[in-house]
Amino acid sequence: VRIPEPQSRPQELNQVVFACKRFMETVCQNRNIEIVMDLSEESPVVNLDNSLFEQVLVNIIKNAAESIDRDGKIYIRTTVRPTCLEIADTGKGIDKDTETKLFSPFFSTKPNGQGIGLIFIREVLLKHDCRFSLRSYPDGLTRFKIWFA
């Protein structure tokens, strides 16, 4: 997956998140999935390419919605210190074996998946000098966490 060099500018993370939430609400409402926002009072300002990062967020939220299928919740949270964005879902979760393969080219758990969505996400986040993790936790939530430099 070839990703263009990011054209990064200072952005308020909460505004970027809110724009993506509005875009994904229709998809989620059709599946009876509630998007719950917990955005920090002070909006973190991060350097990012708005267009690329919105594609990352839409991909993550879409994956979360597909994992839930119907009747669940997606939680979106931002924090300032550390500057972090977390997207958690009540979907079916990720087992340990799958977790190790998630960012491998052409690996997918979806019947017709091509395995390029997470590769795209990984490449964009690396180009933004972000650290990230994707795993399921004992509380039943699967969390995609992104830490900004």
Residue ranges and their predicted role:
Residues 1-149:
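Core catalytic ATP-binding domain of two-component histidine kinases
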